[in-house]
Amino acid sequence: MCIRDRFIFFQIILGAFLAGLDGGLIYNTWPDMNGKFLPDDVSIASFFSSESFNTPSIIQFIHRKMAYILFILILYLNIVYIYKKLPIINILLFDLAVLFQIFLGVITLLSGAKIFYASLHQIGSIIVVSSFLYICYKNINTNLQPSN
């Protein structure tokens, strides 16, 4: 498992924590968090507290920033695909799934976590993982696979 894989699964776990803590009901602005980079009720020290995974604003902050990091990693993956002259169709499904997931995440947030959008966003995570597994399968014989 390479770092990109870990980021995807960590992002899904953060989303599960966020849903469980009803974190989508707070800070319903985007791209900032009520006009600020860091939420009002969070300090840098609180990130290192034992309660950090019970604080919805911290989870939402990390979930948002992880999404940006994942987007950059996926852009890099696309560049590698083009550079190695691999069939772009293999990664197109993954790209579309990720873009749709980002769109759903923003819509879910701006809607105040309406159940329809929140459910679609959770289903979208399954589609992202499935499409990622598909490109891993399609590239099993290339050097894009991480070494153990």
What are these model-derived regions, one by one?
Residues 65-70, 120-128:
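Membrane-embedded alpha-helical segments of multi-pass membrane proteins
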Residues 18-28, 102-126:
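Interfacial helix-loop-helix junctions of multi-pass membrane proteins
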Residues 78-94:
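Membrane-interface helix-loop-helix junctions at transmembrane boundaries of multi-pass membrane enzymes
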Residues 12-70, 75, 79:
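Membrane-interfacial catalytic/cofactor-binding modules of polytopic membrane enzymes
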Residues 1-3:
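Short, small-residue-biased leader/transition segments that mark boundaries at the very start
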Residues 8-13, 97-106:
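Aromatic-anchored segments of alpha-helical transmembrane domains
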Residues 51-61, 85-89, 109-119:
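Juxtamembrane loop-transmembrane helix junctions in multi-pass integral membrane proteins
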